[in-house]
UniProtKB/Swiss-Prot annotation:
Location of region: Disordered: 24-44
GO molecular function: structural constituent of ribosome
Record's compositionally biased regions (Basic residues): 31-44
Key words of the record: Ribonucleoprotein, Ribosomal protein
Taxonomy, superkingdom: Bacteria
Protein known as: Large ribosomal subunit protein bL34
Source organism per UniProt: Acinetobacter baumannii (strain SDF)
NCBIfam families to which the protein is assigned, alphabetical: rpmH_bact
A family per Pfam: Ribosomal_L34
Cystine pairs: none
Family to which this protein belongs: Belongs to the bacterial ribosomal protein bL34 family.
Biological processes, Gene Ontology terms: translation
Cellular component, GO, one term: ribonucleoprotein complex
Amino acid sequence: MKRTFQPSELKRKRIHGFRARMATKAGRQVLARRRAKGRHSLTV
């Protein structure tokens, strides 16, 4: 049985990246929340 986590940098960027977040209203809300909280890193 193979392990479930098979990392792919491309998929990671496309789903969780900055431009993906900026593309939707909800994603922009995520960024706003993380800025308000003072996160050092907003996206992956």
